[in-house]
From Swiss-Prot:
The gene is atpD. This is ATP synthase subunit beta. It is a peripheral membrane protein. It comes from Lactobacillus johnsonii (strain CNCM I-12250 / La1 / NCC 533). Its main location: membrane. Belongs to the ATPase alpha/beta chains family. Keywords: ATP synthesis, ATP-binding, Cell membrane, CF(1), Hydrogen ion transport, Ion transport, Membrane, Nucleotide-binding, Translocase, Transport. Its EC number is 7.1.2.2. It is an enzyme of class 7 (translocase). F-type ATPases have 2 components, CF(1) - the catalytic core - and CF(0) - the membrane proton channel. CF(1) has five subunits: alpha(3), beta(3), gamma(1), delta(1), epsilon(1). CF(0) has three main subunits: a(1), b(2) and c(9-12). The alpha and beta chains form an alternating ring which encloses part of the gamma chain. CF(1) is attached to CF(0) by a central stalk formed by the gamma and epsilon chains, while a peripheral stalk is formed by the delta and b chains. Produces ATP from ADP in the presence of a proton gradient across the membrane. The catalytic sites are hosted primarily by the beta subunits. GO terms for cellular component: plasma membrane; proton-transporting ATP synthase complex. The keyword Cell membrane applies. CDD domains: ATP-synt_F1_beta_C (cd18110), ATP-synt_F1_beta_N (cd18115), F1-ATPase_beta_CD (cd01133).
Length: 480
């Protein structure tokens, strides 16, 4: 392989000169350099400057590098371990284990992180609903197996908590292979997640890849591709249905913006890189279902300053089948998960996919909540007394629906001391149908807050000294 030498180091950007009489390394090739401490650093070729000089981005800290050091071309892109050996382990962007466990053997298969998206005739579409056990998601923005989902929200509204709950619920119920990719998020959260998964017994079916906040932009930009490469192998070679969790896809964009500035490119709107749509497309087009297997992707998307028109979340929107929008207003009201039932969407909310009953209940719930939102202006100015009897009934039912959309999470039990609940879709539909049909009008709205299925509401109401009058609700109470 050809060898060159470092001619310039500016932070994570390293310029390397190769002899003109030798073949130059290709774009995206990995280069190796050994610093004074004997540590091997990996650089990725990103630009050709001319006269044999290549501009590269380092995947690790460039401390200890200096001009004149020898650099070797590996002849291929960064490659990472794939297959069964990755399960139960934690890796960095280069595929090196960082969990303190044994090193992987030399015979472990490795694949390059840069690939083409599957061809059009290889793609497969699925209309099977993926049950999450979270009421607001299953009812109003159902997720499709093999689809792409975005969890949108500003800082501190609960994106990571929902991702952790989905990992818990789906791993317990679905039992398939999961790949978790931490992109530019807090190391503490990754550590907590690792030990939680170890304790719950799902770690043996999960591969974890981390490129956290403290790492150079090159690592944060490429770590999503590392996780995706591991997931693609399970899909294409093992023929499995894989769950790919990415937290947070915005940090991928942010790292790309940093790299773009370091490479000297002219920024575009709001300071983002001019290649934003291309980079996002190259990643998202690989996350898909083929005739061999599927990748169901759930991605947290940080929304800067709660501004959904920001280019980063706006570019991500175009690639998703379902969106779960988290709203700070609901956090302030103490409703968790703080999912906005009117702004969240799903292409699967269709009577031919979810069934007539599910669709009708979901549409009626949205209609009642929409009407309540319209009436809030009148209530805030004139008060409840100015509403007609029908409007008062809508407000009461809407508040019950709003509270019933909340529930306790398993992953939050260590903080709240309250056990979480998994609610099957059938139970979710039954509960909301009873509310919109007026069968629970006599129960206090506080009984609907942070509960699981409708049985919990009726039990909660009885503790408050209220027995339901409706025969169906009474029968549920007696059955319990």
């Amino acid at each position: 392989m050809s060898k060159g030498e470092i001619v310039q180091v500016i932070g994570p950007v390293v310029d390397v000169e190769f002899p003109l009489d030798k073949d130059l390394p290709d774009i995206n090739n990995a280069l190796r350099v050994t610093n004074n401490n004997g540590d091997t650093l990996v650089l990725e070729v990103t630009l050709e400057l001319g006269d044999g000089v290549l501009r590269t981005i380092s995947m690790e800290s460039t401390d200890g590098l200096r001009r004149g050091m020898e650099v070797e071309d590996t002849g291929a892109p960064i490659s990472v371990p794939v297959g069964k050996d990755t399960l139960g382990r934690v890796f960095n962007v280069l595929g090196d284990p960082i969990d303190g466990g044994p090193a992987l053997g030399k015979d472990v298969k490795r694949e390059g992180i840069h690939k083409e998206a599957p061809k059009y005739d290889e793609l497969s579409t699925s209309e099977e609903i993926l049950e999450t056990g979270i009421k607001v998601i299953d009812l109003l923005e159902p997720y499709v197996r093999g689809g792409k989902v975005g969890l949108f929200g500003g800082a501190g509204v609960g994106k990571t908590t929902i991702i952790q709950e989905l990992i818990h619920n789906i791993a317990q119920e679905h039992g398939g292979i999961s790949v978790f990719t931490g992109v530019g998020e807090r190391t503490r959260e990754g550590n907590d997640l690792y030990f939680e998964m170890k304790a719950s017994g799902v770690l043996s079916k999960t591969a974890m890849v981390f490129g956290q906040m403290n790492e150079p932009p090159g690592a944060r930009m490429r770590v999503a591709l590392t996780g995706l490469t591991i997931a693609e192998y399970f899909r294409d070679v093992e023929g499995l249905d894989v769950l790919l969790f990415i937290d947070n896809i915005f940090r991928f964009t942010q790292a790309g913006s940093e790299v773009s500035a370091l490479l000297g490119r002219m920024p575009s709107a709001v300071g983002y890189q001019p290649t934003l749509a291309t980079e996002m497309g190259q990643l998202q087009e690989r996350i898909t279902s083929t005739k061999k297997g599927s990748i169901t992707s759930i991605q947290a998307v940080y929304v800067p300053a709660d501004d959904y028109t920001d280019p980063a979340p706006a570019t991500t929107f175009a690639h998703l089948d379902a969106t779960t929008n988290l709203e700070r207003r609901l956090v302030e009201q103490g409703i968790y998960p703080a999912v906005d039932p009117l702004e969240s969407t799903s292409s699967a909310l269709d009577p031919e996919i979810v069934g007539e009953e599910h669709y009708e209940v979901a549409v009626k719930v949205q209609h009642i909540l929409q009407r309540y939102q319209e009436l809030q202006d009148i209530i805030s100015v004139l008060g409840m007394d100015e509403l007609s009897d029908d409007e008062k009934l809508i407000v009461e039912r809407a508040r019950k629906i709003q509270f019933f959309l909340s529930q306790n999470f398993f992953v939050a039990e260590q903080f709240t001391g309250i056990p979480g609940s998994y609610v099957p879709i059938k139970e979710t539909i039954k509960g909301f149908k009873m509310i919109i049909d007026g069968k629970l009008d006599d129960l206090p709205e506080d009984a609907f807050r942070n509960v699981g299925p409708i049985e919990d509401v009726i039990k909660q109401a009885e503790k408050m000294g209220v027995t339901p009058k409706n025969p169906e609700a009474k029968a549920i109470l007696e059955a319990k």
